[in-house]
Amino acid sequence: MARVKGGVVSRKRRKRILKLAKGYYGAKHILFRTAKEQVMNSYYYAYRDRRQKKRDFRKLWITRINAAARMNGLSYSQLMHGLKLAEIEVNRKMLADLAVNDAVAFTALADAAKAKLGK
């Protein structure tokens, strides 16, 4: 039987990795071994940062809500507690959006929270 050298398969594998490494800096988009390492790292970074993104956005929303709440004479925790007592279910993303884009509506929510807190 003739020996099969697998050139087509190897080339296909290398081509796939180098295609994924397109746009990388320096040798990382040219040399197969370094490109392969960088692609593996890139997969790791992507996996990690998909989770990190959720934390980052939550932190951003809380910061924005806190700033707007303090402009209305409440702290973040007081506002959230007051909203819970007033049975107003609005998530942090929506609250942050109101704080940035619709100050009047946010003030109305803050006033409702203040009323339930007895302030």
UniProtKB/Swiss-Prot annotation:
One of its GO terms (molecular function) is structural constituent of ribosome. Keywords: Ribonucleoprotein, Ribosomal protein, RNA-binding, rRNA-binding. It holds the Pfam family Ribosomal_L20. SUPFAM superfamilies: Ribosomal protein L20. PROSITE patterns: RIBOSOMAL_L20 (PS00937). The keyword RNA-binding applies. It comes from the Bacteria. One of its GO terms (cellular component) is ribonucleoprotein complex. The keyword Ribosomal protein applies. One of its GO terms (biological process) is ribosomal large subunit assembly. PANTHER family: 39S RIBOSOMAL PROTEIN L20 (PTHR10986). Belongs to the bacterial ribosomal protein bL20 family. Binds directly to 23S ribosomal RNA and is necessary for the in vitro assembly process of the 50S ribosomal subunit. It is not involved in the protein synthesizing functions of that subunit. HAMAP family: Ribosomal_bL20 (MF_00382). This is Large ribosomal subunit protein bL20. It comes from Streptococcus pneumoniae serotype 4 (strain ATCC BAA-334 / TIGR4).
